């Protein structure tokens, strides 16, 4: 009788653990689901707020990720550090909101193979600043 009771208790505990694990995975997937794409504007250098511009200049030598808020807007910045030569651009693949974060996905695009750049002996410091509505969520860079 005791053996049967112990076996039944073990089976119930195992069932409970499996049920709780399955539920937590489902909740995690729901929190990563895209709620909506966010509208954004790529900001030119002369439109970047002064305080943010100073921080970018300090950090431009190395890759960086910065967020900045001002007047109801969220500025999301990414820099790719020092790159040899010029001809680089940055593509925004996605900017979207989930239940608990803003996801920002970009790609650094370099000069095409064989494409002449202005001067291979100089360096460039590609970075991108986008402006979107302020949402009080952390930014996840992909």
Question: What are these model-predicted stretches?
Answer:
Residues 1-10:
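Bacterial N-terminal signal peptides that target proteins for export
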Residues 7, 22-142:
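Exposed, flexible binding/inhibitory loops of compact, secreted disulfide-stabilized domains
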Residues 17-20:
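Bacterial Sec-type N-terminal signal peptides, specifically the leucine/valine-rich hydrophobic h-region
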């Amino acid at each position: 009788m005791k053996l049967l009771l112990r076996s039944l208790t073990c089976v119930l505990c195992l069932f409970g653990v499996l049920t709780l694990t399955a539920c937590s995975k489902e909740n995690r997937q729901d929190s990563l689901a895209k709620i909506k794409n966010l509208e954004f504007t790529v900001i030119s250098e002369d439109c970047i707020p002064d305080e943010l511009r100073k921080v970018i200049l300090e950090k431009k030598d190395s890759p960086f990720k910065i967020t900045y808020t001002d007047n109801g807007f969220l500025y999301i910045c990414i820099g790719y550090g020092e790159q040899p030569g010029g001809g680089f651009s940055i593509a925004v693949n996605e900017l979207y909101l989930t239940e608990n974060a803003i996801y920002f996905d970009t790609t650094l695009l370099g000069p095409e193979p064989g494409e002449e750049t202005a001067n291979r002996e100089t360096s460039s410091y590609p970075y991108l600043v986008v402006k979107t509505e302020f949402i009080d969520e952390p930014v996840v860079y992909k």
